[in-house]
Amino acid sequence: SVFITTNLLSQSKLALIVAVGEYPATSKIKPIASVNDVKYIKTALGRNGFEQKNIDTLINSKATKKAIINSLTQLSEKAKKNDIVVIHFSCHGQQIRDQKTIELGKDEDDGYDEAFLPYDAMPKYSPTGYKGENHLRDDDLYPHLLNIRKKLGSEGSLLVLLDACHSGTGTRDESFAVTRGEPIPFANPENPMDSIINLSAAEAKQGFFEAAADSLSNMVVI
């Protein structure tokens, strides 16, 4: 009884919310309702005992790749045994040519990494400019998530919500819906690859459309 009480008192509930719905005009990335997701997620977290001071939010221009990585690092440093951690990403998703990493090597059968588009990412490859350095790859996330998971131990919990996808069969009328994701993979056109896989709240081959005012997936989650 004493052990259980002590265990619960020492448990913290930590969260990181990343939402990018408005990108720089120069990127020509379509706006989406990601920022509206934040209020739903924060409300749900509050109902489950998360204190506002323990919920870190990165919205639009604040959600650069560097800022996201820094927040993940800080979250990893704060997390301890038995804690509960929730990480939510709501933004555009896109595939990008697989790159070899020390941890994973070449890990994608189709030759593409799944990636999120932070605020400072661009959707198209340029041989003289942007080459994908600000895309947030699954390989970028993996070491942070693995480290957090290890620190939480067997009694802790890590929940990761990934709300991004590519175009496909819509679940709503396209006249008032927009896709959450870039349908064209990010790659050097001199070495194209044709496979497309969703990084999404949907199945790998499902399209995901959101109503103009709010995200669909988080309304289901809540």
Which residues does each predicted region cover?
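Short beta->alpha junction loops
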Residues: I55-K65
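A short, charged/proline- and glycine-enriched loop
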Residues: L9-L14, S215
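Short glycine-rich His-centered loop
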Residues: S12-I29
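Signal peptide-proximal N-terminal region
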Residues: K39-N54
